[in-house]
Amino acid sequence: MNLRQVEAFRAVMLTGQMTAAAELMLVTQPAISRLIKDFEQATKLQLFERRGNHIIPTQEAKTLWKEVDRAFVGLNHIGNLAADIGRQAAGTLRIAAMPALANGLLPRFLAQFIRDRPNLQVSLMGLPSSMVMEAVASGRADIGYADGPQERQGFLIETRSLPAVVAVPMGHRLAGLDRVTPQDLAGERIIKQETGTLFAMRVEVAIGGIQRRPSIEVSLSHTALSLVREGAGIAIIDPAAAIEFTDRIVLRPFSIFIDAGFLEVRSAIGAPSTIVDRFTTEFWRFHDDLMKQNGLME
């Protein structure tokens, strides 16, 4: 038994005629007849009764047809899936990201990315940067977005260097400034990132000598921005998180450069993935365009 014989059987069952089946398969009628005869010999079943110019499927043929049709539906599904994979519309994509991105830019971009990819299975994990690196290293994530040093063994890394911005409540005295200096923060309550993070250390180096009111310490950028929105204080923040709040707070450049960029992390081990390549390329384009539109990146 071979696939061509099964295809001939399916064509005859679909059309009900040898001639029509031959046209469907783009072969001659004698060729179809030979394939059906060989298929009957291979299965040791009489599949059709010949009555003049007509052929009538036997009960055995009808029973076999159910399985053959189911198999061809499966083959068609495989073909469609292969086509989807070829145009990056199917497969799996596992993303681990620090909360500043997992709660903001990434969901916005991801909704756009999957719109024309209905068969793409995606997982998005919001994790601390250290755990993002672990997820990529262990193979639990295909891509990671994290804060941290750029020199890391065993990873492929791409990054953007972005200046942190100052987030102030609407109507605040600093909202009228073109640029905020460390001295402008004197007497203000600063909402700062969790002590010990790389970004928090960078901020403290920049404003450490300024007299301020007691600070509020938070673990998430979005928490800091929500507090700014409610008038609780001022935050020096990464623009990737702040972009989600531009209609509710005021963002101003800071006079001292504080690197608020992030890393795109992929494992250096293993074969590249077309869908991952497409995602990362399109995400950086989306990110850069959005930052430029809002004056947060040159």
Curated annotation (Swiss-Prot):
Pfam families (UniProt xref): HTH_1 (PF00126), LysR_substrate (PF03466)
Gene Ontology molecular function: DNA-binding transcription factor activity; sequence-specific DNA binding
Any one of the GO BP annotations: positive regulation of gene expression
Alphabetized UniProt keyword annotations: Activator, DNA-binding, Plasmid, Transcription, Transcription regulation
PANTHER family recorded: TRANSCRIPTIONAL ACTIVATOR PROTEIN LYSR (PTHR30427:SF1)
Family per record: Belongs to the LysR transcriptional regulatory family.
Name by which UniProt lists this protein: Octopine catabolism/uptake operon regulatory protein OccR
Annotated region of DNA binding: 18-37
Job of this protein: Positive regulatory protein for the occ operon involved in octopine catabolism and uptake. Also acts as a negative regulator of its expression.
Record InterPro entries: LysR_subst-bd, OccR_PBP2, Tscrpt_reg_HTH_LysR, WH-like_DNA-bd_sf, WH_DNA-bd_sf
Domain HTH lysR-type: 1-58
